[in-house]
């Protein structure tokens, strides 16, 4: 799992639960108890980060630590500035991608880029069964990604650094208290959204294209990065997002998507077994059901082959009527054959299918077919509708529940697998080449 950066050593209120914040106030000799808890609730209710006792230094010589949130130090709460927005349309409404700037990690080779790097998040409209629109917020857990999936834009960047829990929660904070608040006519939010930027008129126009009556109802960890490569910060961020004094999102409305890091799955499963975490959503990016094909497009498979991944999924704690989601990015000429449809069905069916190589029980899972969204310089096109329909029909015929993910935001590089900029990869390579000794 990724090493912890120095930016995690002193947390901010955005990266703490209410009880952790109250403990920090008490340790610092600040107003604690009910006063601190009410202050915490007010921050997440109003979006105001300028109140008293939101940042203070430790009175002791002990070094503050994220692992000990009761330490008496809090960094100033800062929500990363939104630098750009991109708008596209879908049948359910406007899709808005926003880019925030965060500090680069000290000593990183990306020093040539300046003091900041960028993360991307997407506000995605969803129409429920009753016709009510809500928004799903797709958040990033890292800047770039180390997993190397060949079909993914973010993977082409390489890993720049992981995000802290506060930076992850900050994406939700920016979406709710800046973008959506500006959509509803909040002048202070509009000022935060466009502060000092020449594109201010365009950004306001984008924000106002959203539905002012809609709220963020779901959060998916499907943006930049591999969540289980940063699992402790992701777990902490979920703890904050579900805190009843904070954002108060039901844990059942949060989904973590992973390429299948077996060690990270085991760590997350231990937390899901605890009360209050039982209904956390899990999505596994499988994309091929044989080791040869999956290893070609997903290097993680060389470390954790399909059999190991499936064994860990059999151990995943599932409560009530919940199920996990098997994600399958359908790539023309790579994993779209009839045999591929049968193989991914057998991965779910396990020993209940006579043709399955997996003897274990049937997974409590559905297959989510995702038509490939081409990255920059992609060697593959998007699949045709006919190909998607044929592939899904073959899975359905095997008795496995299958759904298609509707494509949203492809034209603005906001769809699944399209987040990130290759400029970072190019400049990182240039920096490495400049530092390498010449023959």
What are the roles of these predicted feature ranges?
Residues 98, 121, 137-139, 282-284:
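Short beta-strand motif preference
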Residues 125-181, 185, 195:
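Canonical Radical SAM [4Fe-4S] cluster-binding loop centered on the CxxxCxxC motif
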Residues 1-119, 125, 133, 180-191, ...:
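Auxiliary Fe-S-binding modules of radical SAM enzymes
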Residues 123-124, 233:
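Residue-level structural signal for beta-strand termini and adjacent loop
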Residues 88-90, 140-141, 257, 285:
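Short linear Ser/Thr-Pro motifs
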Residues 180-183, 200-394, 398:
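Conserved AdoMet/S-adenosylmethionine-binding subsite of the radical SAM
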Residues 172, 192-204:
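Surface-exposed acidic, glycine/proline-enriched linker/cap segments
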């Amino acid at each position: 799992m990724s090493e912890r950066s120095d930016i995690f050593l002193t947390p901010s209120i955005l990266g703490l639960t209410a009880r952790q914040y109250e403990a920090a106030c008490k340790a610092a000799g600040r107003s604690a108890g009910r006063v601190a808890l009410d202050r915490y609730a007010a921050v997440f209710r109003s979006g105001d980060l300028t109140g008293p006792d939101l940042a203070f230094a430790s009175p002791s010589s002990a070094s503050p630590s994220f692992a000990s949130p009761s330490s008496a130090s809090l960094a100033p709460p800062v929500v990363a500035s939104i630098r750009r927005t991109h708008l596209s349309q879908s049948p359910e409404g406007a899709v808005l991608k926003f880019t925030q700037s965060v500090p680069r990690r000290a000593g990183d080779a990306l020093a040539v880029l300046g003091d900041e790097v960028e993360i991307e998040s997407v506000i995605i409209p969803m129409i429920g069964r009753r016709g009510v629109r809500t928004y799903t917020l797709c958040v990033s857990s890292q800047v770039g990604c180390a997993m190397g999936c060949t079909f993914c834009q973010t993977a082409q960047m390489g890993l720049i650094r992981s995000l802290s829990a506060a930076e992850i929660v900050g994406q939700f904070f920016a979406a709710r208290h800046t973008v959506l608040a500006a959509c509803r006519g909040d002048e202070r939010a509009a000022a935060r959204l466009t502060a000092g930027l020449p594109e201010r008129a365009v950004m306001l126009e984008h924000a106002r294209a959203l539905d002012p009556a809609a709220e963020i109802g779901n959060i998916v960890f499907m943006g930049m990065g591999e969540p289980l490569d940063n699992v402790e910060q992701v777990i902490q961020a979920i703890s904050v997002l579900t805190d009843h004094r904070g954002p108060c999102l039901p844990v059942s409305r949060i989904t973590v998507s992973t390429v299948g890091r077996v060690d990270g799955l085991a760590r997350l499963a231990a937390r899901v077994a605890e009360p209050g975490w039982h209904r956390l959503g899990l999505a596994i990016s499988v994309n091929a059901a044989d080791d040869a094909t999956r290893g070609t497009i997903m290097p993680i498979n060389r470390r954790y082959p399909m059999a190991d991944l499936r064994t860990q999924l059999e151990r995943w704690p599932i409560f009530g009527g919940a199920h996990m989601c098997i994600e399958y990015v359908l790539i023309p000429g790579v994993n779209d054959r009839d045999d591929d449809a049968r193989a991914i069905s057998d991965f779910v069916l396990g020993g209940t299918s006579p043709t399955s190589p997996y003897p274990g029980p049937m997974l409590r899972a559905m297959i989510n077919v995702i038509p490939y969204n081409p990255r920059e310089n992609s060697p593959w096109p998007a699949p045709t509708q006919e190909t998607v329909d044929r592939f899904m029909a073959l899975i359905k015929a095997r008795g496995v529940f299958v759904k298609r993910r509707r494509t949203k935001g492809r034209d603005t590089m906001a769809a699944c697998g399209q987040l990130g900029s290759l400029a970072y990869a190019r400049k990182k390579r240039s920096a490495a080449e400049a530092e390498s000794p010449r023959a």
